[in-house]
Amino acid sequence: MVKIGVLLMNLGGPERITDVGPFLYNLFSDPEIIRTPFPVFQKPLAWLISTLRSTTSQQAYLSIGGGSPIRRITEQQARELQSKLREKGFNATTYIAMRYWHPFTESAIADMKADGIDQVVVIPLYPHFSISTSGSSFRELKKLRDSDDEFKKVPMRCVRSWFSQSGYLKSMVELISEQISLCESPSKAHIFFTAHGVPKSYVEEAGDPYKQQIEDCSLLIINELEKCLGYSNPHTLSYQSRVGPVEWLKPYTEEVLADLGRSNVNDLVVVPISFVGEHIETLQEIDIEYKEIAEKAGIKNFRRVKALNTHPTFIEGLSDLVISCLEGPLVNIEEASQLPEKVKLYPQEKWQWGWNNSSEVWNGRVAMIIFLVLFIELISGSGPLHKLGIL
């Protein structure tokens, strides 16, 4: 029987406080997260940002127990998916490839080679495609595969995004319905979708389909929820987790929460739409920071829908996703890692540092170059600012 390897790709996260700095360094070393004008600046900038952010991030992880549960939850998802696939008659073994912390993609490839896998199915644990999540993981996998003559021979099928998959939608509706049923007036409960944001330039310059997929997904969930409940709830979509001075996708979660409070919303059902497992953004950012903002805004009942984790309907849906990938049209790693052509938007390979598009982007890039020059002068101890006596 053919040996099938199911590779689950995820972000990764620090398991201990001492992991936080190295994890952040790995994150900001990725050019899909932060782009510098010249590649040589990438790692020095990553070191600087990770050093500056480390203490604050450590405090956030301490507030949820001292580390991220993302590896433990992903391993549980992998085990249950493997069991479900074997129940359905597939000789499948699951593997985990984290992008920025252990176990890394290299480790998963080594394990698949050692196990003699005949075919690989790649599932990003991000329902919606983005340059900075699935795209980065696919491109890392492609780079490693291209450099490994043995692994390159193994057939590989990829799922690019799966936000419209029936099992995913059904599991989301089940978990949302649980929280709605606890509200004082279920039909009046406000459904508040919050998705991880990305810089606006990813969408407008690079053609990232993430925003459109998030919007489509929220409407699909609302439609399925209405069929399930028999009534329609008011709903809102926002974006969280922005960092830095550039504009990210709007509306911002904290601003919408304040608006909903002013609108006298009493029952708020918060749906972390872009997260399939609990981690820092759900446990700390939503459960602590945003809950406090909501309460200060006057929202009486703040109910957060659990992440999918190992919800049985979700695991069943993942198994169906793997099977449909095996039986459906081939999507190889080259196709999975590329952005679609979009009118008036740049394909990913052309999304380079340059002077184009909006004045906001232009000014931001000038500021970044000035910052990098200043950083180099601080490190080297010499330069025009030293000669002028400013430094």
UniProtKB/Swiss-Prot annotation:
Its EC number is 4.98.1.1. CDD domains: Ferrochelatase_C, Ferrochelatase_N. Keywords: Cytoplasm, Heme biosynthesis, Iron, Lyase, Metal-binding, Porphyrin biosynthesis. It catalyses: heme b + 2 H(+) = protoporphyrin IX + Fe(2+). PROSITE patterns: FERROCHELATASE. Pathway: Porphyrin-containing compound metabolism; protoheme biosynthesis; protoheme from protoporphyrin-IX: step 1/1. It comes from the Bacteria. It is found in: Cytoplasm. It is an enzyme of class 4 (lyase). One of its GO terms (biological process) is heme biosynthetic process. Fe cation binds at H196, E281. Catalyzes the ferrous insertion into protoporphyrin IX. PANTHER family: FERROCHELATASE, FERROCHELATASE, MITOCHONDRIAL. This is Ferrochelatase. It comes from Prochlorococcus marinus (strain MIT 9301). The gene is hemH.
